[in-house]
Amino acid sequence: MRHVLLIFCAIIATEALLNTGLQLKIDELFDTPGHTNNWAVLVCTSKFWFNYRHVSNVLALYHSIKRLGIPDSNIIMMLAEDVPCNSRNPRPGTVYAARAGTNLYGSDVEVDYRGEEVTVESFIRVLTGRHHPATPRSKRLLTDHQSNVLIYLTGHGGDSFMKFQDSEELTNVDLAYAIQTMFEDNRYHEMLVIADSCRSASMYEWIDSPNVLSLSSSLTHEESYSYDVDTDIGVYVIDRYTHYTVNFLTKEVKALNSSANMQDYIDSCPARKCLSNTGVRKDHYPKDVKRVRVTDFFGSSRIFQHLSEEIVLDDEFWA
């Protein structure tokens, strides 16, 4: 009888612990990121000078994720239009996302696919890893089952498609097929898909692969809008959704240890700012987005701390 009472007391004590701090620790463990590396595929699908903003969309986001630790080796950037060298550009060799901003096209920018290289086929090949054997490593998405992958698409779109080069279309079925192939080949751990175009929510309608969180700048029946026009060059320089994305990352995610979560990011561009209703699909994403850090997708998997003071290594260190 005494042993029975001891066992009963132990069970009660265990339940009490589970309902307090221990349970919180267990919950935190399940939300701990399981990835070891981060990758990004940033795609501007539009050609022509008047689509200047789609190039600056990609470049602005590129600089944000590089600031948060994702290296060029883990970023595949595709620009369908060579805006910096366009003869209409009054500031040759530059791209700006704001009238009083900084040049986004500096010497530290690495473009992997440009101009006519940016096609539906090349994009699908990047995702699936099915390249010609001579394709260099810099043009390959070398992900594995522990990779968190950010896919960002910007350009012109319609119901169930995005235009590439104004001559062909990437359909939502094409995108879903590529992501499913990635899942079957263990090419990602978790994925964030962002489509910034008109009617962009239609692009994730067919995605059924697990661990994929999908976002869009507009719903299927809505347009997506530009943000700022530069009268000196006569075109819009960034889209609203990307502007508020970069603004959020700049102000709220200043370092890799930021506590900003994905719900904060989703809420960063309400309809009063974006002028359209942003789309979210999370039925294939098992985690609570309030408990997923923004840096799980927009930053490096490793936290770096920059030191400003001088460090002197004495003889004992080298012994």
Swiss-Prot record:
Keywords: Glycoprotein, GPI-anchor biosynthesis, Hydrolase, Protease, Signal, Thiol protease
Gene3D superfamilies: 3.40.50.1460
Residues bearing carbohydrate: N257
Superkingdom of this protein's organism: Eukaryota
Signal peptide: 1-16
EC number: 3.-.-.-
Any single Gene Ontology cellular-component annotation: GPI-anchor transamidase complex
Pathway linked to the protein: Glycolipid biosynthesis; glycosylphosphatidylinositol-anchor biosynthesis
Pfam families on file: Peptidase_C13
Sections of the chain in a coiled coil: none
Key word Hydrolase present: yes
MF (Gene Ontology): GPI-anchor transamidase activity
Root EC class: hydrolase
InterPro entries (alphabetical): GPI_transamidase (IPR028361), Peptidase_C13 (IPR001096)
GO BP of this protein: attachment of GPI anchor to protein; GPI anchor biosynthetic process; proteolysis
List of catalytic residues: H156, C198
Role this protein plays: Mediates GPI anchoring in the endoplasmic reticulum, by replacing a protein's C-terminal GPI attachment signal peptide with a pre-assembled GPI. During this transamidation reaction, the GPI transamidase forms a carbonyl intermediate with the substrate protein.
UniProt similarity note: Belongs to the peptidase C13 family.
The protein's name: Putative GPI-anchor transamidase
Recorded name of the encoding gene: pigk-1
